[in-house]
Amino acid sequence: VTPMLAADVVILDGGLEQGIRLGMVCRVTRGLQSVGELIIIESRSGQSAGLILELVKDSTIQAGDIARIKTIQNS
């Protein structure tokens, strides 16, 4: 995850080639700790952009955080 200047959008290092599609919801974690959730608003071959939907209290999404597609199993 790479933060942008816009407060509510982050850039992900994965995109269409990694199966990330428009509208997917991702959970963002740092280590074992949940940081928040985002929804994919744009996806290109190797990058995508996500709009932050929710942040855990007093948390921010930082470079190096891991975004995983939220599925029924890991929700």
Task: State the predicted function of each range.
Residues 1-75:
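Surface-exposed, polar/charged interaction patches used for macromolecular assembly or partner binding
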